[in-house]
Structures are given as C-alpha cells and as structure tokens.
Amino acid sequence: TVLAGRQVAATVNAAIDALSEDLRQAIVLREIEGLSYEEIADVMNCPIGTVRSRIFRAREAIAIKLRPLLGTREGERW
C-alpha cells in the first residue's frame, strides 16, 4: 500500500541519516547518485576495497532497521 511504502521510505531515510559520514557518503553515491565503485573511490579518495566494505556495512545497517518493518529475521533477505 501507499502507507507501507511511505513507512519503508521513512525508515530507510532514517537509517541512512544514522550512518557514520563515511558509510552514508558511500551508500548515497552508489544507490542514489549511481556512481560505480571506482568513481566512489575517486570521490572519497580511498581504495576500492574500502568503498566495497563501506557499502556492505551501510547496507547491513539499513537492513537491520528494516527487519521489523518487513517481518524478516537476521540472515533472511526480503
């Protein structure tokens, strides 16, 4: 429903806001701006492995916040 979609969007936004600056910048550049890992590494002036790690950690943190809303448990994907 529209209400559920809004609730998910609000939860995702709150989860992104709660991330550390490095994690937030990496996930926004990837998922919102659509940059490649290589482009993000250039923008953030760090190795590509660091970018991959930051994006992974950001996605995990967001997933943890979404679990109660989506009715999933740890280890499950939606």
Residue ranges and their predicted role:
Residues T1-A14:
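Acidic, proline/glycine-rich intrinsically disordered inter-domain spacer in sigma factors
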Residues V2, S36, T72:
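Glycine-rich ATP/GTP-binding catalytic cores of kinases/NTPases
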Residues L3, R54, L66-L69:
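Intrinsically disordered and other compositionally biased segments
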Residues T11, R54-R57, A61:
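Residues within the DNA-recognition helix of helix-turn-helix
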Residues N13-Q25, L29-T50, I64:
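Helix-turn-helix DNA-binding module
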Residues R24, R59-W78:
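Short, Lys/Arg-enriched C-terminal cap helix and immediately downstream tail that follows
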Residues T50-S53, E76:
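Intrinsic disorder/low-complexity segments
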